[in-house]
Swiss-Prot record:
Catalytic residues (UniProt): 7, 68, 141
Protein name: Crossover junction endodeoxyribonuclease RuvC
Lineage: superkingdom: Bacteria
Cofactor binding, note field: Binds 2 Mg(2+) ion per subunit.
Gene Ontology molecular function terms on file: crossover junction DNA endonuclease activity; DNA binding; magnesium ion binding
Residues reported in the UniProt entry to bind Mg(2+) 1: 7, 141
Cofactor: Mg(2+)
Length: 172
């Protein structure tokens, strides 16, 4: 299965694609960020994020998309920008009929390090090891996107089976 992980943000939106599956070691397909200038208007920045994610969807052809859930922060402007960029990714995936997994930072950390309280250095170290990379992906947004993709690769299929077995059938 090929998964696109999206670490949403307006200044830097991390994107990472991995391939893998049950009993198959995950490997890196592509990793990077979409950058927008902090001086640009929000609408312009969201369009740039949308164009960037859309290009990644075209180029890498994922089967699923994993997006970080927004969590409360002291800076409301940061929260709003993160939520807006995440919504762009969700809409683009939905328009293509791709399943979307939403994960909290602690769920992602637990999936890749075994601890929901891991710091960025621990997450980066594990991403480097799990994907057999020679160096850690930079910036941190790119590493976080790969962590999201791995989290979905490992947890997404089980969650889908659980949802389809629940009364009322599958939901998104």
């Amino acid at each position: 299965m090929r998964v696109l992980g999206v670490d949403p943000g307006l200044t830097r939106c991390g994107l990472g694609v991995v391939d893998g599956g049950l009993g198959i070691r995950a490997h890196l397909v592509e990793v990077g960020v979409v950058r927008t200038p902090a001086t640009a208007e929000v609408a312009e920045r969201l369009c740039a994020v949308s164009d960037g994610i859309d290009a990644w969807l075209d180029r890498t052809r994922p089967e699923a998309v994993a997006v970080e859930k927004v969590f409360s922060q002291a800076n409301m402007r940061t929260v709003m920008g993160t939520a807006q960029a995440g919504a762009v990714a969700i809409v683009l995936a939905a328009r293509r009929g791709l399943p979307v997994g939403l994960y909290t930072p602690s769920e992602v950390k637990a999936a890749v390090t075994g601890s929901g309280r891991a710091d960025k250095a621990q997450v980066s170290f594990m991403i480097t090891r799990l994907l057999g990379l020679t160096e850690a992906p930079r910036p941190a947004d790119a590493a976080d996107a790969l962590a999201l993709a791995l989290c979905h690769l490992w947890r997404g299929p089980a969650l889908a089976r659980f949802r389809s077995a629940a009364p009322g059938g599958p939901t998104r």
